[in-house]
Amino acid sequence: MGSRKHYIGLSNFAEVSPHLLRGAQPGADGLKQLKEMGVGIVIDMCSSKSEHEEQAVSELGMRYIAIPWHCPFPNDKTFAEFLKVIHDNPDAKIFVHCRLGDDRTGMAIASYRMADEGWSADEALKEMKEFGFHGWHRGVCFPLTSYEKDFPEHLKTNPVFQELETRKSLSH
């Protein structure tokens, strides 16, 4: 289970693993905290790329990666891209966020938990709810919960995940 921590400028923040952190969209103070923690990559999963955040992250010497997606439409490509960033940067400390750090961030972390740590969909969904996952996103995102429950099957059958699974089997 993610270890919740409290820092100025970082809401809904937790350590998922020693190299993966999660939370809500950080402000200037939060970005400075992330830099002090040794974060090298900030993944923004908000619905659109933030030029302002990209500049602030770059000025602090971190790398900004936008993986924008609109909440009602989760798709395998988004999560494959997220997992690829993690796999391509095994020594980097990574922070992932969306606006509130609950629904999109929760789904990204759940995809990591199921793909890399072997969690069941129910275990991942339980953690998502502990970090504020709504499953219906204020009446907008009805398909989120069903997508997460079906994710293990997507992971096995969608070719977009094939490269990730091949890498994983080679590293064991």
Where are these regions (language model features)?
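Conserved lysine of the Walker
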Residues: 104
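Cys-dependent protein tyrosine phosphatase-like superfamily
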Residues: 1-95, 107-172
